[in-house]
Design a protein with these regions (language model features):
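A conserved mid-domain beta-alpha-beta active-site/ligand-binding segment of alpha/beta enzyme cores
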Residues: 161-163, 168-170, 178-188
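Glycan-recognition surfaces in beta-rich domains, encompassing non-catalytic CBMs
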Residues: 172, 176, 197-200
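Solvent-exposed loop/turn segments at secondary-structure junctions
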Residues: 18-21, 56-61, 86-91, 117, ...
Length: 200
């Protein structure tokens, strides 16, 4: 964030599945990814920002690792948000281990990229079941000292407490409506604002 505060030119990138792509949002500017990008623009008016969205529906971290360069890293991002916690479907311990390995390969590729991007892990959740690969993904994130956001521990928990209904959030139990995109963006922005405050 120091570079943004100095007014430098930065690229904000996103890599994930259909939620990152913007599934069910009424317009691009209503997606969580674009809302997070707009936070950077509004928080650092002196800087110039570029937006790259590498979200493709139905893709897991294995495919994400294969397409990371062409869909995101070739643009030399300075900040990257990674979201594959619901696309990495670990139905068995063996599958969980497999996706943890592919996720580690993806995260390693991003953090070691020459542009040295700051990385943030976003963990979405199946609202109808609570399933997510966040525990496995967060273990990888902790290894690389990458901060993470848990939607299961925030929005999903509030839903279970009765503050939201399942019908208010994803119409199919997973993919976000406009409200959920806004809420997810809010959780990411909350962490970004905490990081910004630590640096001041």
């Amino acid at each position: 964030m120091a570079r943004a505060a100095r007014g430098e030119e930065l690229t904000i990138g996103f890599l994930g599945g259909s939620i990152t792509q913007g599934s069910l949002a009424s317009a691009e500017d209503k997606t969580y990814a674009y809302r997070v990008y707009r936070w950077w623009c509004d928080a650092f008016l002196q800087a110039e920002f570029h937006y790259v969205n590498g979200g493709i529906g139905g893709t897991c971290s294995c495919f994400g690792a294969a397409r990371a360069v062409g869909d995101l890293l070739m643009y030399q991002p300075d900040v990257v948000v990674v979201d594959f916690s619901v696309n990495d479907k670990g139905e068995t311990p063996e599958e969980e281990s497999f996706y943890q390995e592919t996720y580690e390969g993806l995260l390693r590729r991003i953090v070691s990229w020459p542009s040295s991007p700051a990385v943030l892990v976003l963990n979405n959740v199946y609202y109808d079941s609570g399933k997510t690969m966040q525990d496995r993904h967060n273990a990888v994130a902790e290894h690389y000292r990458v901060p993470f956001v848990s939607i299961k521990d925030s929005i999903y928990r509030k839903m279970k407490e009765g503050r939201y209904s399942l019908e208010e959030l994803p119409p199919d139990g997973l993919h976000p409506n406009a409200l959920r995109h806004e809420l997810v963006a809010g959780e990411v922005i909350r962490l970004l604002e905490e990081i910004r405050a630590w640096g001041e």
